[in-house]
């Protein structure tokens, strides 16, 4: 790493890109997300030595949405082993949209990767638990442990909104069930899926979760929360597929493992250096925080930390 980061540097990057929020949009297909303030933006960085840097609205809670997929992927591998998980879902990037059924129809019905919705539904079905409630409590507890925040909860309004309007996800799940890719009760699997996408986090929480993945699964005290090999797998999947059909552009412009969510969050991992959490609800036409994408591009260029 060539340059050090500080609050003034972060302020400059954020304020330089904040006007882009005017051109962003809020997602209309999840009504609960339409109440966000497009001008909000926050960033939080946790370095491996424990030092933190932050600016803006880094403590505003928002729903984690698809960023939860990296947590459930790690759990599914820890619960079942990578061989079983990747016998149900692939590792390959795709040019299709995150909620497209086309990859399932064009192949053997197995989702190409765990980051698209179909793949994440398969991964969710593999989380251990006697009931959907027990499954979700394990996911919530694990999220709290990774973020070192026992107060993380679910946004019940967002959950109900997603459950009510999630017909595309429902169609994906029933397609997967019909093809024998997933086992169990479809509605219970979707209940768990919608709930873990509705977990409330902050940019600070994301930065602390990213820290774990940057530190090969260890927390600040050295406790191994995720096996190092699992972290490596998740980072690789993030790098290839974390931004769906925008992943290639993100790799070129930003160049670190990261995952976006339509709630406006981005989690970024700089292996061996830092975890990054960002929140900016104004989205570009691919469903990524428009300010967050550009701030990360400037930040990684300044720090010279791109993995490529």
Swiss-Prot record:
InterPro entries: Beta-lactam/transpept-like, Glutaminase. Substrate binds at residues 66, 117, 162, 169, 193, 244, 262. The keyword Hydrolase applies. It comes from Natranaerobius thermophilus (strain ATCC BAA-1301 / DSM 18059 / JW/NM-WN-LF). It is an enzyme of class 3 (hydrolase). It comes from the Bacteria. Its EC number is 3.5.1.2. The keyword Hydrolase applies. Pfam families: Glutaminase. It catalyses: L-glutamine + H2O = L-glutamate + NH4(+). This is Glutaminase. HAMAP family: Glutaminase. Homotetramer. Signal peptide: none annotated. One of its GO terms (biological process) is glutamate biosynthetic process. Keywords: Hydrolase. Belongs to the glutaminase family.
